[in-house]
Amino acid sequence: MLKFILRRCLEAIPTLFILITISFFMMRLAPGSPFTGERTLPPEVMANIEAKYHLNDPIMTQYFSYLKQLAHGDFGPSFKYKDYSVNDLVASSFPVSAKLGAAAFFLAVILGVSAGVIAALKQNTKWDYTVMGLAMTGVVIPSFVVAPLLVMIFAIILHWLPGGGWNGGALKFMILPMVALSLAYIASIARITRGSMIEVLHSNFIRTARAKGLPMRRIILRHALKPALLPVLSYMGPAFVGIITGSMVIETIYGLPGIGQLFVNGALNRDYSLVLSLTILVGALTILFNAIVDVLYAVIDPKIRY
C-alpha cells in the first residue's frame, strides 16, 4: 500500500507541471493586456507598468521566474487588486469556497447514497419511482437555474432563508448555495448507487448470506454496501471537479466571497496573474483529490493495487 501511495504521488508531479506550463503560456500568449481598458494609457505609462511586472521580459524568462516563485509558495502580485498579492486574495477567499464545497460534497454523498440504497431495496415500488424521478429531474436542471429558483421560493416568497451573502459562513446563509451546488450530484450519486446496489444484491455471496439467515440490515451494511460504493467512489473525482467549477456560478449568484467569484472577477478584469494562480490551485486540488480517491479505491478493492 505504501508503494502504491508513493507511486500515485510521483505520478501527480508531472501532471501538475504540465498543467502549470500549459496554463502559463495560454495566459501569457492570450491577446490583450491586463492594463488595457476603456481608457487608453500613454505608451510611456504602459511601458513603465509592464517593466514593473516584468511583462516585457522574454517569455521563457517570465516562465522560469514564475516557476521559481511557485517553488517558494508565491503566486505573485495581482494586476488589478494593487494593494494585495494573489496569496492574500486566495487566503481570504479559499476558506469560503472550501467550507461551501466540502458541505455540498458531503451532502451529495450522504443523501445520494441513502436515496440510492432505498431505491434499490424498494425496487419497482413507489419509493423507487419517486427517487429515480427526482434524480432524473436533478440531473437535467443545471445549477444556474436551480439557484435563482431557490432564492425566489425560500428568500423572496417564503422569507425563510437569506437570498445571498456569507456572514461568516453562518448555516442559514449556506443552505441555499449548498443545496443548489449539490443537487445535481445528489441525483447522479443516487442513480449510480441504485444500479450498483441492485447488481450486488443479486450476487451469489448475498444469496449465501440470506440463506444463512443473516438479518437484512447486517447484509446491507456489512456485505452489500462496500462493493456497491465502488462505482460511487469512482464518480467522486468528477463530482469534486464539478463542484469546484460549479461554485464559480453559485458564488456569483449568491454574492459569496470565494475563489469562484474571485476567478470570475479576475477573468473579467484580465487579471492574468490571479486567473493563472487560481487555475493552478484548482488543478492541484483536483489532482490531489483524484489521488486520494485512487488510494481509497485500493483500500476497498485490493485487486487494483498494480
Swiss-Prot record:
Residues 33-99, 159-169, 251-279 are periplasmic. InterPro entries: BPD_transp_1_N (IPR045621), MetI-like (IPR000515), MetI-like_sf (IPR035906). The keyword Membrane applies. Residues 1-11, 121-137, 191-229, 301-306 are cytoplasmic. It is found in: Cell inner membrane. One of its GO terms (molecular function) is peptidoglycan peptide transmembrane transporter activity. One of its GO terms (biological process) is protein transport. It is a multi-pass membrane protein. Belongs to the binding-protein-dependent transport system permease family. OppBC subfamily. Part of the ABC transporter complex OppABCDF involved in the uptake of oligopeptides and of the ABC transporter complex MppA-OppBCDF involved in the uptake of the cell wall murein tripeptide L-alanyl-gamma-D-glutamyl-meso-diaminopimelate. Probably responsible for the translocation of the substrate across the membrane. Plays an important nutritional role and is involved in the recycling of cell wall peptides. The complex is composed of two ATP-binding proteins (OppD and OppF), two transmembrane proteins (OppB and OppC) and a solute-binding protein (OppA or MppA). PANTHER family: DIPEPTIDE TRANSPORT SYSTEM PERMEASE PROTEIN DPPB-RELATED. This is Oligopeptide transport system permease protein OppB. It comes from Escherichia coli (strain K12). The gene is oppB.
